[in-house]
């Protein structure tokens, strides 16, 4: 399935509202996401000063685990701290210790253009933490048949925005395989001047599959949740087959 590119930008906010409703009625999903947020929390470098900023916060629930995190989105929803656009941030140069993008990278039509802006605002040694879908063999099947956003592992990735592009031109876009291709499979390793790859970690999460995410039905309850954790342990040595999620940490190089 090809990358989504024909929907208006407001589709993102429609999905945020739907996700808030799903969050309120799916306890298994909440538990899984809090575990994911804790994975991000332990990757914050305590030696860095400056704000921790999440871009594309959506529901803003990361504050439940990282309370000091500044939550932002394209849309000025009242539960968020501020409005930001990844292509043109209002943050100062070298002012931020960490940027967190949770399920946001694959919505960037021009990731190289956004990455240059992230590099501008991060202080030297600052971290860009991405949490994304993993395009393992099993995950591709699950996301293809049970999620509305395409994986798009064969579509071209347009790294830089065309001449004349402005942040106001940002539109709805989705290609879930983008981070996998660029960081796990290595297609983007030669496109990272000024960055150091600190970590690329595929994560098995059968309980995430079983939860149905935000858009699908939840399968089972607490018992199934425990069973899925057991499957995660068994499948962990085979990430290219079974990984559901991908954690990427980039560091801005120190001059």
PLM region spans:
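Conserved N-terminal segment of class I S-adenosyl-L-methionine
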Residues: 1-87
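Acceptor-substrate binding/catalytic loop of class I
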Residues: 167-186
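Conserved class I S-adenosyl-L-methionine
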Residues: 128-164
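A short acidic, Gly/Pro-enriched loop at the edge of an enzyme's catalytic core
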Residues: 87-99
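A short SAM/SAH-binding and catalytic strip from SAM-dependent methyltransferases
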Residues: 97-110
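A short glycine-rich, Lys/Arg-flanked "PGG" loop and its adjoining helix->strand segment in the class I
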Residues: 112-127
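Short aromatic-enriched loop/helix-cap "lid" or pocket-rim segments at secondary-structure transitions
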Residues: 65-66, 82, 139-144, 209-215
